[in-house]
Amino acid sequence: MLLCDIGNTFLHFYHKGRIWKEKPYALTKKKENLPIYYISVNERFERCLLASHPHCVNVNEHIELQTQYVGLGVDRKAACRAIDNGVIIDAGSAITADVMQEGVHIGGYIMPGLEAYRRMYSDISPVLNREIEPGVNLSILPQNTADAISFGVLKSVILMIKNTSRTKKLYFTGGDGKFFARFFENAIYDNTLVFKGMQKVLEKQI
């Protein structure tokens, strides 16, 4: 069984513990006897997968989650299905936070990802068009513009997560997940959360 998470930039694949990503218009041919089960938040990229691999199974409708949140993305639902208690932080193009308690989704929120923050600053003024410096000192107030931008971005994200998690265990995933996880003692980085959630659902369905 091959699992696929179709996002807004790449298609992420999972097979026997291995994860890799492919561009939608440069997909490698998979074995015909290996069924592909996928979730998708991008219809255009989904069509790319189906054009080259017509015998795929969309499991979006099977990813159910007990929640009052309206419009929760299927990728976030799948990640939430992987745990019963804790806070899931998916730090990618956007940074999402979802709180799980006894298998119930309590709620969540969305913040810009690091690259989105950088673009927002550059839209304000060319002077603010600076890269986010991950090594900026967060213990002292900055004394220059470049550090001030990085400090403001990172500190706002970190403090928001700390305020949400408090004593709860944190599960980080996504491209910048490993970076943010190092700021928290009660955190682990697991880039397989979405696929673990998919597997849990599929075990009951097939």
Curated annotation (Swiss-Prot):
Spell out the InterPro entries in the cross-references: ATPase_NBD, Type_III_PanK
**GO molecular function: any one?**
pantothenate kinase activity
Provide the protein's localization.
Cytoplasm
Quote the catalytic residue positions. 75
Q: Which GO terms describe its cellular component?
A: cytoplasm
Pathway field of the UniProt record reads: Cofactor biosynthesis; coenzyme A biosynthesis; CoA from (R)-pantothenate: step 1/5
- Which reactions are catalysed by this chain? (R)-pantothenate + ATP = (R)-4'-phosphopantothenate + ADP + H(+)
Amino-acid positions noted as binding substrate in the UniProt annotation, renumbered to this chain: 69, 73-76, 145
Q: Which residues bind ATP?
A: 5-12, 93
The record's remark on the cofactor is: A monovalent cation. Ammonium or potassium.
Q: How does it assemble?
A: Homodimer.
Query: According to its UniProt record, which protein family does this protein belong to?
Result: Belongs to the type III pantothenate kinase family.
User: By what name is this protein known?
Assistant: Type III pantothenate kinase
Gene encoding the protein? coaX
